[in-house]
Amino acid sequence: KHPLLNTFYKTPAHFYEVDVKDFYLRVNPMLLLAAGSETEEGVASYYNQRGLSLRGGVGENVFFQTSFYDSQVRYPNYINQYTDSVGVVPGAALYKNFSSSLFDVAGAKDFLLATAYVGVNLGKYIGFQLGHNQFFIGEGFRSLFLSDFSTPYFSLKIKTRIWKIHYQNIFAE
């Protein structure tokens, strides 16, 4: 279990990692490849996403995270119809039609996505997070206002902890 070129994968969880006194940085590539087919119409669907994630912190109270994604997707027809009618990809916003000289990719979409935030903890009871991101509360829960269907948006999150009560304020654009 030796690091690749004495630099990469020094720890199994991170492609590249810097961990020194009062500073850490973790860099990870992201890859999502998936394929399927729509049974009624026999149309092949796929998801080809590549990206990079950076996560770090300064001291114990300042932290940041950013992710960049490049995606080529061929959705099932019912999602393509919706995407074409509203002009946006769910969760990612604007797209362009993707074409390839090697493969039949009629109806495929090409889009970029970037998210980032910076956070500060003021002691153990109050924390702030400012960025361009999506919010998810819980695992699989959706509220009237927060959804994984939305695109990333500019926001300020304030977390407060008093006794056993954890309170979040989210101010979003």
Protein language model features and the residues they cover:
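Outer-membrane beta-barrel channel domains
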Residues: K1-E173
